[in-house]
């Protein structure tokens, strides 16, 4: 699989990193980072106790939403919420009345309550949470989205199913992670 440099993609769409505050992404990343307390693990040795997988992905989502004035985002795989929160931040910063639909069977209510203590409430106002497997939820959604992110179950069959179920749903951009 070919590695894609996010900075190259940002240049392709003429989006300047200097136009945004990376501190906002750091702040969201801090609260959504996976925690690893095992000081002997390779992850801890290379990333410290916090691990921010695909940090640049949030910047790309933000750039696409603000640059192209996208109004709808479908996310398969909420995980710790980084992508959805970056999308919500983009909607807020660009003054877009946007909508986020996120699908994940493992969304935890307690985790969301904790996040709400640190992340602006307005970010959550535009997010609809669907606590189901994508294979069950997607066939029930009869609409299109400007941006779709497939980042759920990473097995071949699950990704193939997510692709089959979303290929007619995205209008402008599709991201696989």
Predicted region positions:
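Rossmann-like AdoMet
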Residues: 1-52
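S-adenosylmethionine/decaboxylated-SAM
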Residues: 44-52, 56-177
């Amino acid at each position: 699989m070919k590695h894609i440099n996010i900075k190259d993609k940002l240049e392709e769409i003429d989006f300047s990193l200097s136009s945004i505050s990376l501190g906002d992404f750091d702040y969201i990343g801090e609260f959504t980072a996976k925690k690893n307390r095992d000081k002997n693990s390779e992850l801890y040795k290379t990333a410290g106790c916090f691990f921010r997988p695909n940090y640049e992905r949030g910047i790309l989502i933000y750039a696409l939403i603000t640059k192209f004035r996208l109004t709808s985002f479908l996310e398969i795989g909420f995980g710790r919420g980084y992508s959805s929160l970056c999308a919500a931040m983009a909607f807020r910063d660009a003054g877009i009345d946007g909508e986020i639909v996120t699908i994940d069977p493992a969304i935890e209510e307690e985790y969301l309550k904790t996040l709400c203590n640190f992340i602006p409430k307005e970010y959550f106002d535009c997010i609809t949470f669907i606590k189901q497997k994508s294979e069950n939820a997607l066939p029930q959604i009869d609409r299109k989205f400007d941006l779709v992110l497939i980042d759920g179950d990473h097995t071949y069959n699950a990704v193939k199913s997510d692709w089959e179920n979303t290929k007619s749903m995205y209008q402008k951009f599709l991201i696989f992670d």
